[in-house]
Amino acid sequence: VRRALLTLTGVLALAGCGGTSTPARTTLVATLGDSITAGSPGFDPDPLMRDTLGFGADEKSQWQYWAERAHPELRFRNCGVYGQRTDQIAKRLSRCARGAQVLVVQGGINDIAQGRSLDVAAADLRRMVERGKALGLQVTLAELLPWNNGYPEADPKIRRLNELIHGLARAEHVPVLPFYSTLEDPDRPGRMKEAWTSDGDHPSVEGYRLLGERAFRLP
């Protein structure tokens, strides 16, 4: 999460995740965010970046993969870009949301990692919610995850930004996906369970599965 490496826009609709016997999908969910949306480190939605890196092709390393299996009437577009702050994510909203009915907005950990103001990051998230609603989309926000490699210094900032996200959600009447609480280790508050993180920064495949199956809900 801390390395600002990827700046290419990744837009990939997950194809065929539900098999041939599932109902026709009628709702497109655009997911906009940083590496947590992208599926790092196991997946990157940009095929050119996968070719450059030589890895990142494990589709199961996305919460959207598991959410689509749990909700076969939905189709997901992955617009996650590794290392981006909320201001950078916001610039990609219109392209990501094109043709979608639902928009999931996720971001903020790279703002913290780069020493950016929490209030400024929250304002960026607010503008994305407002823009999504103006486009006629159902919008939902996502909490920041615990950050094992940033613990304990980053955790108070993560919790504070999550508080701001929930306040924004109440003001804008949009839901929040409980990413933090879903992956927080009850025995080690402020951190993800070891089995749920691949590198201390991002979820493992099992962590992404929990986010897709337990945390995701339609707005």
Which residue ranges define each predicted feature?
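Bacterial N-terminal signal peptides that target proteins for export
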Residues: V1-L6
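Bacterial N-terminal signal peptides
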Residues: T7-A15
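Serine-esterase "nucleophile elbow" of acetyl-processing enzymes
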Residues: C17-C79, R92-G99
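Structural recognition of the beta-strand scaffold that forms the well-ordered cores
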Residues: V29-L32, T37, R75-G80, V102-G107, ...
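Oxyanion-hole/transition-state-stabilizing segment in secreted/luminal serine hydrolases
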Residues: T31, A38-P45, R85-A122, L145-N149
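Active-site segments of SGNH/GDSL-like serine hydrolases
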Residues: Q106-N110, M128-R160
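Charged helix-capping and loop-helix junction motifs
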Residues: L118-R126, K157-N162
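Catalytic His-Asp segment of secreted/periplasmic serine-dependent ester chemistry enzymes
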Residues: P146-P219
